[in-house]
Amino acid sequence: MMTLEADSVNVQALDMGHIVVDIDGVNITELINKAAENGYSLRVVDDRDSTETPATYASPHQLL
């Protein structure tokens, strides 16, 4: 179980069971690390070039 406090959360369903989550007011590094600790997989999408970066544990170069 993960508990998360955020200013706002927006979730959009995609195909094949995937979702997109837009979260404001959260430390993204802490979120990715906590998700990985719980066996979940998150990807960070950089809007500038729409490149998906697999993120098991967050590092600064993944969070451009």
From Swiss-Prot:
A Pfam family assignment: DUF5983
Domain of life: Bacteria
Miscellaneous section: Encoded by the CP4-44 prophage.
Protein name: Protein YeeW
Gene field: yeeW
